[in-house]
Amino acid sequence: MGACEPPNFSWVSEGRLAALGMPREPGHYRFLLAQGVRHLVSLTERPPPHHGCCPALQLHRFRVPDFTPPAPQQIRSFLQLVEEANARGEAVAVHCMLGHGRTGTMLACYLARAQGLSGSDAIREIRRLRPGSIETREQEQAVIHFCQQAGAGEDSKEL
């Protein structure tokens, strides 16, 4: 069986961090490996199907209920994982069910840190790159709170 692109796949930082919806078949994992992805971060409460089919792709589980934001410690752990993997030349991909809400929240925090953006600017940028990202006010607030805690700029304006 060959590789096939997973749903809603795109690079947020080429060769470093990608996003996608839930991978559902072995070809999706082979596609990720072919793209240089070595770490798959799953934000869903259940593990993705067939995740054991490609042992070279390490699965990292961060259980976040649908339509809720990741906890601050989950965001920090995710960003550390991305930083450490990238330092070794390894790409990371992150997914939730559709690759929008929980995934978008993590990606906006990544962009805020990587590009020095405020929370609202990071949210706008991830929505430009991946339309539909960040689905709830609580997810928006998680990004803004992360940025305030990280000193990435004062940010309390409405989006």
Regions inferred by a protein language model and the residue ranges of each:
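Cys-dependent protein tyrosine phosphatase-like superfamily
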Residues: M1-V92, M106-L159
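Short cysteine clusters
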Residues: C96
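Conserved G/P- and acidic residue-centered "switch" motifs that form tight phosphate/ATP-binding loops
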Residues: G99
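Ser/Thr-glycine-rich phosphate-binding loops at phosphate-binding pockets of nucleotides
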Residues: T103
